[in-house]
Amino acid sequence: MSWSRSILCLLGAFANARSIPYYPPLSSDLVNHINKLNTTGRAGHNFHNTDMSYVKKLCGTFLGGPKAPERVDFAEDMDLPDTFDTRKQWPNCPTISEIRDQGSCGSCWAFGAVEAISDRICVHTNAKVSVEVSAEDLLSCCGFECGMGCNGGYPSGAWRYWTERGLVSGGLYDSHVGCRAYTIPPCEHHVNGSRPPCTGEGGETPRCSRHCEPGYSPSYKEDKHYGITSYGVPRSEKEIMAEIYKNGPVEGAFIVYEDFLMYKSGVYQHVSGEQVGGHAIRILGWGVENGTPYWLAANSWNTDWGITGFFKILRGEDHCGIESEIVAGVPRMEQYWTRV
């Protein structure tokens, strides 16, 4: 009898598996399926004529890796607003509103870090110091402490490197801003754009250079920015909110599924598709949309993606692990005393 039940269970599982519809990633069928579910988010096309190998390459964060020391709780007695947007709280800090482009490289772990570090330097100096911290410097020089460069890395290692070795300035690709601007070119997700197409895996990790680009002053060593401490934030909705409210944006990481690639608006919740990989982003606020609490975050897939590069994701339920991998830190303030 038990053998018969086992056969029936297997047949039932097989039938259920066959009944779950499969939609190719990046397809119109997947977009239509997500939108028909009428959830809190809306889907659309962010990647046109783009290889899935390129998209998988973008998700370059190793989840569950080395953890930064966790800071103590301090949110219990804080009165936090229902909505908070660091772009509005610190309007004189331009990096908070910036969307970067990691190009064909799994460097999201580095981008999430340098973006939040740039923001925090401005926040902690009361907007007296505004700098784009170099993703190139972190990506190319951190080495195995951070992971494998364009083949993936650890957010905790990125923040530790900032405190121990420091990071120079550096803007977007071909910007010639700062000591070491990003050297991996952006690519075009859309059909009719000015960038080259996004194809293949590509994305060789740039060579570490401890020299600024010609004509830039001060020197590489003199241009370094340091953190005094880096830490993990407890896996608590209120603790993460308090951290952002007090110190500015943080770096977070989560599991990307195929439906996230199609995000266009609303509050993202995973409803369809398989895992693509781990991805790091910058969380810069929170809010409530039509009764659904969300985190406000910045991606590094250029302004074509999502809401001009930004997105909202379900808050308070550790959705896709978004609240489990929060890392942050505080700048070493004495290096800025002459300017604040």
Curated annotation (Swiss-Prot):
The active site is at C108, H279, N299. The keyword Disulfide bond applies. GO terms for molecular function: cysteine-type endopeptidase activity. The keyword rRNA processing does not apply. It catalyses: Hydrolysis of proteins with broad specificity for peptide bonds. Preferentially cleaves -Arg-Arg-|-Xaa bonds in small molecule substrates (thus differing from cathepsin L). In addition to being an endopeptidase, shows peptidyl-dipeptidase activity, liberating C-terminal dipeptides. It is an enzyme of class 3 (hydrolase). GO terms for biological process: apoptotic process involved in morphogenesis; proteolysis involved in protein catabolic process. This is Cathepsin B. PROSITE patterns: THIOL_PROTEASE_ASN, THIOL_PROTEASE_CYS, THIOL_PROTEASE_HIS. Keywords: Disulfide bond, Glycoprotein, Hydrolase, Lysosome, Protease, Signal, Thiol protease, Zymogen. Dimer of a heavy chain and a light chain cross-linked by a disulfide bond.
